[in-house]
Curated annotation (Swiss-Prot):
Function of the protein: This protein is one of the two subunits of integration host factor, a specific DNA-binding protein that functions in genetic recombination as well as in transcriptional and translational control.
Keywords: DNA recombination, DNA-binding, Transcription, Transcription regulation, Translation regulation
SMART domains per UniProt: BHL
Family: Belongs to the bacterial histone-like protein family.
GO molecular function, one term: structural constituent of chromatin
SUPFAM superfamilies named in the record: IHF-like DNA-binding proteins (SSF47729)
NCBIfam families xrefs: hip, PRK00199.1
Gene3D superfamilies, A to Z: IHF-like DNA-binding proteins
Protein name (database record): Integration host factor subunit beta
Coiled coil ranges: none
Amino acid sequence: MIKSELFERIAEQKINISNKMIERAAKEMLEHMIISLANGKRIEIRGFGSFSLHYRSSRIGRNPKTGKSVKLNEKYVPYFKPGKKLRDRANIHK
């Protein structure tokens, strides 16, 4: 599902909020999440999951095209840990 599909699904719920307002609220929420993560803050949405940054130390990698070794710098990467409710629902249709 892409953002526009998410906005449409929310609008279909007949909650008397315009599509533009739904889109604006969702974009604003995502922007604040990005800013919080960029500032090193953890985000927790109960039942859904949590977002945080994980540290990756520098290491020697390999360019898959050429096979040559390359140095990969240290960095932080976004990490998502699903909450219990999300994990349980994901396994309902097994």
